[in-house]
Curated annotation (Swiss-Prot):
Protein name stated in the entry: Ribosomal RNA small subunit methyltransferase C
EC annotation from Swiss-Prot or TrEMBL: 2.1.1.172
HAMAP family listed in its UniProt record: 16SrRNA_methyltr_C
Source organism (scientific name): Actinobacillus pleuropneumoniae serotype 5b (strain L20)
Similarity comment: family membership: Belongs to the methyltransferase superfamily. RsmC family.
Sorted UniProt keywords: Cytoplasm, Methyltransferase, rRNA processing, S-adenosyl-L-methionine, Transferase
Function per UniProt: Specifically methylates the guanine in position 1207 of 16S rRNA in the 30S particle.
Amino acid sequence: MLSLESEVLTRHLPLFANKSILLFGDVRDRFADQIKANAKSVAVFSSYFDYARQYADVSFGLYCEIKAELAVFYWTKNKQECQYQLLQWLSQVDVGQEMLIIGENRAGVRSVEKLLEPYGNIAKIDSARRCGLYHFELQSVPDFDGKKFWKSYRLQDLNIFALPAVFSSAELDGGTQLLLSTFNKADRLKGKVLDLGCGAGVIGASLKQQFEKIKLTMSDIHAMALESSRRTFAENALDGTVVASDVFSNIEERFDLIVSNPPFHDGIDTAYRAVEDLIAQAKQRLNRGGELRIVANAFLPYPDLLDKAFGSHQVIAKSNKFKVYSAKA
């Protein structure tokens, strides 16, 4: 099934004929298969591991270094993330480079005109399916300074670092704050700990600082989150393993504690698939007596999922907005 963005692109198939093509940005479907027959070659790059892991021909990472005669960028909901990815890629190509930018109007794709105008000619060439399609030709190669995109803030004795689109990138969010408040030195936490959906590494860094002897693994699907966690740990001289994983897809070991402030937003829609998988599979990923501890908006339907997977659960902290759930294997 094609996304709305790709449906618009199918109206312009002649543009892809006999050219090397790169699809990158928020690619979520198999539009690549639609153009392989007529294009010279098709490459796909994604910063999202949940998508990239499904297909052998999709490259995953933070920096896209793939060149092509025509690039197609799928706009994401986060303007700064788009700016980072577009300027990073354009900084390494030549004047005259052609690019198409496609995105939903509600995701703010219109702002691409102001973003790319200083670097070349940009024009809207189609409007359909509540999306805008733009053609861009590079006239002035931009300088890309990745350092300018970093945000940081202080959390007690920790320095937290985050790239665009990483959750809780500017300050500690209320849910994570409530979750962290349920840990204290008296817990004597030890063994293997997994911070799943680690974002900027806030939870993992806080636990590692309090409980030095834990063996910590942090995972996320977003390349920007993984890089953010790595930097947070490096800047605070903490030890931890950072892995790209779609829930447990790339994690084989068992843990004594799995802790998470799980995402329930996918792009600009709400999605529960990752959280459902986390709760359903967590018991099999815990050692005997191990614990799953998660925080969530109070209105989300997690109690039933926890009871189905574990038999029972406890609410160990709550605020007006959030609840912290604990379930034991």
